[in-house]
Curated annotation (Swiss-Prot):
It catalyses: ATP + H2O + 4 H(+)(in) = ADP + phosphate + 5 H(+)(out). GO terms for biological process: proton motive force-driven plasma membrane ATP synthesis. This is A-type ATP synthase subunit A. It is a peripheral membrane protein. It is found in: Cell membrane. Produces ATP from ADP in the presence of a proton gradient across the membrane. The archaeal alpha chain is a catalytic subunit. It comes from the Archaea. The lineage of its organism: Archaea, Methanobacteriati, Methanobacteriota, Thermococci, Thermococcales. Keywords: ATP synthesis, ATP-binding, Cell membrane, Hydrogen ion transport, Ion transport, Membrane, Nucleotide-binding, Translocase, Transport.
Length: 585
């Protein structure tokens, strides 16, 4: 028990804290606000408080809890909405109304709800950390696997029968090698700043299919990969992340709203229960965990929310699921680090950010990955991290963007000009890149189309050629270009408007399956080949531009039937044959 001697914003200094540990959770002041020790000097402790500190004064008590900031991992996580330190917001609302009173705590997992537990092991079985003890149907989509905590191993001496239990009831007793008995419940706690262990990291060879053509075809994300979405305000970072949370083929989605507008979290809460998962037809909310730490919540909790989210994601990964984690936005998290660092009077680095910004960002993204999990059955799980970055004024040379780009392998550069032109997703195809293309091309060739890489590279080269031609057009106008280059501009316009641009509000076009993506690309590249032949044979470019099939190609993104899209190849060939006859070519 210590006493407060100084309060500066979210930082509190207390003395008489002998025996306290780094990162220990403490209750601060008469109200019992939740805080975490972030520095120890002699018997003084510097505490960052996760709640508003107004009204706290020197002399009030500070009480240690003896444990570090941890999350509860067990059934009841999915469909929940938490704040940055895993307090369930719906329970807090019942306790204090629409505005959260200070010093409130509530268990993260519901204590009174009964879950139907089916055991998967029997008495006498040897178990190690990560083994599956049993399963609980948490939602209609996800079966929650009850795991042996990583630090436990031994022989099962008692196990509960199949039936309904709360998370507090003991379901298994394990006799450890030293003869002591460990009682296991359906949940365990894990410190958020410690990454959960695994057996082996695997190379990222499987793409995370998002149904967004720009991303899947050109700037692919791999399962277990890391991606950054930097962009200026209003360029569509949050909407792009919502699209990825809705349609990516991860089985579990953890969405962290970190320091962004509250209404954006409301959007997710209103939309996700109505939306259906394309694979199961069930509401998307049933596979989602939301962590809301909006801009009007205390700054210090922003820093914790990122760790809370990734720990929950790692827990589902350990069950053998593919998890996608969206962090929106890591810039606000970095700003929270900067504010706390400033209050600690640390030496500032570039633009006032702390000198350890780079290592903190790297530490977060390094927790992503595709792994063989702990346990005897060699499960494979993954955590893919997609972090939005909001640089002030859209300046990509800013420290948070630069340090993020050093660590992540995929860069989706959002462009305010494209967003203003209503081009969604506003990912600039000239500035973005993905370093996973080589690793995942085998998957595309085996499962979708053996010519995927060739078509992708051809289309990319055309888009780069268009950028060069646009500069000439701006200076001398389009009429000065030779026919061959005019024809390229026709095709690249089709690539931009009919392929890259997508309608997030259209039932069909909001999600484009891989087979359809490749077929659409084939249709456009077939048109390109025929166009080049026609120009070489002397057909005027204006005639090519007037072909009726162009309008159908423009509408193919709204066509759910892939065979009808494929039929456009024959139609294109036929119309070009007629052109060749007409011009005697």
């Amino acid at each position: 028990m210590g006493r407060i001697i100084r309060v500066t914003g979210p930082l509190v200094v207390a003395d008489g804290m002998k025996g306290a540990k780094m990162y220990e959770v403490v209750r601060v002041g008469e109200m019992g606000l939740i805080g975490e020790i972030i520095r120890l000097e002699g018997d003084k402790a510097v505490i960052q408080v996760y709640e508003e500190t107004a009204g706290i004064r020197p002399g009030e008590p500070v009480e240690g809890t003896g444990s570090s900031l941890s999350v509860e991992l067990g059934p009841g996580l999915l469909t929940s909405m938490y704040d940055g330190i895993q307090r369930p917001l719906d329970v807090l609302r019942q306790l204090s109304g629409d505005f959260i009173a200070r010093g409130l705590t509530a268990p993260a997992l519901p204590r009174d709800k009964k879950w139907h537990f089916t055991p998967k092991v029997k008495v006498g079985d040897k178990v190690v950390g990560g083994d599956i003890l049993g399963v609980v149907p948490e939602t209609s989509i996800i079966e929650h696997k009850i795991l042996v905590p990583p630090w436990v191993e031994g022989e099962i001496v008692e196990i509960a029968e199949e039936g309904d239990y709360t998370v507090e009831e003991v379901i298994v007793k394990v006799k450890k090698p030293d003869g002591t008995i460990e009682e296991l419940k359906m949940y365990h706690r894990w410190p958020v700043r410690v990454k959960r262990p695994y057996k082996q990291k695997l190379p990222p060879e499987v793409p995370l299919i998002t149904g967004q053509r720009t991303i899947d075809t050109f700037f692919s994300q791999a399962k277990g990969g890391t991606a950054a979405i930097p962009g200026p305000f209003g360029s569509g970072k949050t909407v792009t992340q919502h699209q990825l949370a809705k349609w990516s083929d991860a089985q579990v989605v953890v969405y962290i709203g970190c320091g962004e507008r509250g209404n954006e979290m409301t959007d997710v809460l209103e939309e996700f229960p109505k939306l259906k998962d394309p694979k199961t037809g069930k509401p998307l909310m049933e596979r989602t965990v939301l962590i809301a730490n909006t801009s009007n919540m205390p700054v210090a909790a922003r820093e914790a929310s990122i760790y809370t989210g990734i720990t929950i994601a790692e827990y589902f990964r350990d069950q053998g699921y593919d998890v996608a984690l969206m962090a929106d936005s890591t810039s606000r998290w970095a700003e929270a680090l900067r504010e706390i660092s400033g209050r600690l009077e640390e030496m500032p680095g570039e633009e006032g950010y702390p000198a350890y910004l780079a290592s903190k960002i790297a530490e977060f993204y390094e927790r992503a990955g595709r792994v063989i999990t702990l346990g005897s059955d060699e499960r494979v799980g993954s955590v893919s991290v997609i972090g939005a970055v909001s640089p002030p004024g859209g300046d990509f040379s800013e420290p948070v963007v630069q340090n993020t780009l050093r660590v992540v392998k995929v860069f989706w550069a959002l462009d305010a000009d494209l967003a203003r032109r209503r081009h969604f997703p506003a990912i600039n195809w000239l500035r973005s890149y993905s370093l996973y293309v080589d690793a995942i091309q085998d998957w595309w060739h085996k499962n979708v189309d053996p010519e995927w890489r060739k078509m992708r590279d051809t289309a990319m080269a055309l888009l780069q050629k268009e950028a060069e031609l646009q500069e000439i057009v701006r200076i001398v106008g389009p009429d000065a270009l030779p026919d061959r280059e005019k024809a390229i501009l026709i095709v690249t316009r089709m690539l931009r408007e009919d392929y890259l641009q997508q309608d997030a509000f259209d039932e069909v076009d909001t999600y484009c399956p891989p087979k359809k993506q490749v077929t659409m690309m084939r249709v456009i590249l077939n048109f390109y080949e025929k166009t080049m032949q026609a120009v070489d044979r002397g057909v005027p470019v204006d005639e090519i531009a007037k072909l009726p099939v162009r309008e159908k190609i423009g509408r193919m993104k709204f066509e759910p039937d892939v065979e009808k899209v494929r039929a456009l190849i024959d139609e294109t060939n036929q119309q070009f044959e007629e052109l060749f006859k007409k011009y005697g070519a």
